[in-house]
Amino acid sequence: MSRCHVAISGFGQIGRAVAELLAGRRAHYRERYGVEVRLVGISRSRGARVDREGLRDPLAADAPLDASLTGEAFVSAARPDVLIEAGPTDYLSGGAALGYLRAALAAGAHGIAISKGALVLDYPGLRALADANGVQLKISGATSAALPTIDLLDYNAAGCEVRVMEGIFTATTNYVLDRMMAGIAFADALAEAQRAGMAEPDPRFDVEGWDTACKVCILANAGFGARLALDEIAREGIAPIEAGQLARWRADGLVPKLVGRIERRAGGERRVEASVRLATYEAAHPFAGIGAGMKAVRIETDAMGELVAIGRTSPLATAAAALKDFEHLLMLGVVGR
């Protein structure tokens, strides 16, 4: 039986969820693909653990870490066939994730990105590096996780032209807006989202529209062939919204949503435009019924018409999106030979 060695960089809540799901699906990988999948390395901010025969109890909190194994040194020691990058998002510099992905792709390992920063900063460069080394770069976990955004573009609508993609890509803002329309103050709604584990302790990344803008930037570049920088995307957040405005929306039967939009413009030079804006929808629109904690995406195509998908957010769903990418690699037969 062939083997596939997997390493995870970034071992917080999502990285640990990836490890748990991976362990639970090992028998499935053996039975369906004839591949023995082994988790050979995990990397945290304080160091890493590596065992080419497979880590025993990778979730052990008290296991010693080798502080010398970070970045390229970790990739060299683990020698993974697949690196799953699950570290924090740093959309200004790409953070440690950028170094891990570059090292893995350059070493001939497939990359599965969950954190967004590296992709926002240099998706074209990472894609070129993957192509040059004959490996795949998969990004489902970074583009609204369980919501099938990049898959809609790459697979479901591959036989036509996608003219518009728009979506409710950030569950935190959708939750807060939903609660505000129910009469809850912004600060209280945000505190609820934090207690539910949906919003970060510093939620500005979500409520100021940065999270949605990052996802839109990645999708525009990866799915529409654009070369947009994050600061080229017009961006709005969800605060402040006055009580009077909320009352007017209620009276008019409108529902507010923070929406990311990508549009392919026609003309002499076909171009892609992207934005994040606070929009309102009548009850008949698909987005109006997307409740608290949910996400949705809609595309307009030339041949298939309109397609809509809806999903829920959670660390487990994000981890599952990364394993969907991993399973696609197994389906392609590019790992475990």
Describe the predicted segments one by one.
Residues 9, 13, 17, 78, ...:
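Conserved active-site and cofactor/substrate-binding residues in soluble primary-metabolism enzymes
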Residues 89-106, 114-143, 147-154:
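Rossmann-fold NAD(P)-binding glycine/threonine-rich loop
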Residues 1-106:
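N-terminal glycine-/serine-/threonine-rich beta1-alpha1-beta2 phosphate-ribose binding loop
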